[in-house]
């Protein structure tokens, strides 16, 4: 007896091909009709007229037969399409009864199904999302917190199954007179494959002097997955912004998640969340950017997460940038995370925020692992228009073998004192000392930081290093003699750091030594009517070296601020430099510089430079810099924080195994940056959170990046959450769409949560879930935002393809938002996604 099988996807493809063929034939027939159905006679005689009539009749008969054939063709294609759909429906119907009793048994005995998604927590209750099926399933999203005097906490996202994404944390509830509710924590990723859930955004606070809610922590990663991104801090138009949530810890081989951005507040920005710790073999996560303020001080950037204990060269996370303030002081940059216990480089310190009255201090670079690794570069100090610039951060200490970190440049001032540069770290056994950071221009100008000493066995001193012992001085003289021929022929030494660009000139930093050495910091741009552009950081040494930090853009006293310089690239081993911050401008803030690319084999990609605000919001802010590209194993760098009216920077792309970087957060109603795309085998980066605004519209969340083409189980990045609109009659920002999973085996990223709104307003629409690969779950739709009058709607959810569950529909926002419908299951096995609540 013979057996016949039907593949619905093959039937559907054949129907599509036949429909295309039908269109081509119809077009050809139509083109021929005019020349074959009404021929002109060759002459006026009867024979010519008869010949023309004969051939015209043949043409008309052909057209009539073609019309009948076309009708039959259309009926055949319709029957084929219907047959494919019937086969698919029959397969799904046959599978569902088989799964139902199995799932019922597991539900009764364990509280979760074998295959299927966890349920969403109901909006306005703060209920936790249910865990996904033990084998295949996404965790449900946490319910949003209740509105009240103090906002209620959002529910935690449910954990993914063995294969599945963790659910997003619920948004914190709105507070009428007290503190906004805390966002729920993201759910843990599936133990084998899947993405960790994003922390929920904190709730906003409406009363004078109140504080926005803290963002929820990102979920922990699975075996290969990175930790989830922390939720954005809640905003307030009359108080202090909430702190961003901490990034989740990475799985065994995963990196820590990026900390959430601090919330906007009139009287003080919220602190950025700390980056998550890397898994045992993973890199640390980047700290979140501090929130923007208008009257007081911007929020401090979050600290970078530490790399895993046994990480083989993975770096600690970079510190987050401090929040800016167009009328007050800038926030301090976060300190860089430390490298692994034995191996790994320290993370770069965060650049500080720009401030009208005073610039914030740059964050210190992280220290390296005990044996091998470079110290992290110190963050640049922030510039100021009226007061003193911010002090540069100190460079981090290296391992026994490795270069010390450069000190950060001091911030410049248009009408006050320039700040001192940060001190460079000192080498230990083999490695160069770090350059001292250049002082900022001003009246008076800041002093340069002290350079670090070279290693006791081999290594050049950093620039501006103090005098040392006679033996060490002799060592430096010998190295100078060795370097002279190479320096004369190529313009760079064999061993040693490149020189810093001169402050106030926008000169590029010099390249590091051909063997090993850090690139010099770019000089900050000149202060003038229009600020000058900052110089690019120098490239690291070919074998080993950190790229120099890009110079900050100059201050524009009557016009536009200067553009920050590009961070220097590392070559084989080393981290890329941080992009320079844009300069303050009276009319327009300067754009941030792009982060430097990571070393091919080891090292972290540089963070994009933050964009500058214009003084007192007279004009627009600059565009934030994009993160640098990762190496073979490193993730792309995070995008910089956006300026007023300008989007956050795009996350850098992975190269081979690395994930895309997180998009930068928007500021004051600007959109978040898109997450970077994963490398060939990497996951997509999470989109940046949209900026909250005291105006009419919150910024839209950035789209999640797509996973790599050959990613095995990696997920598309989650969409960023929409920003809150605090003004009466405003509308919350739209959540970003989730990124697509790998083409063969990958999960769609979850859509971002829509932004909340104030009195007489509407919540933002949740983002669409990302599409799955042939094997994998569709991404969950984002929840609609809270609306005092009308809650935001949820968006569409992709279906699974062959094996996997459809994504859950997102919840509608509290106060009448429309929930989304769940996606359909895969053709072979899987469960339909659950409808939103």
From Swiss-Prot:
Region annotation Disordered: where it falls in the sequence: 811-837
Sequence ranges assigned to domain PE in this UniProt record: 4-94
Upregulation: Expressed in both low and standard phosphate concentrations.
Keywords: Repeat
SUPFAM superfamilies for this protein: PE/PPE dimer-like
Biased composition (Low complexity): 826-837
Keyword Cell membrane: no
Repeat keyword on record: yes
Ranges of Gly residues composition bias in the record: 811-825
Domain of life where this protein originates: Bacteria
Family: Belongs to the mycobacterial PE family. PGRS subfamily.
Protein name, UniProt field: PE-PGRS family protein PE_PGRS4
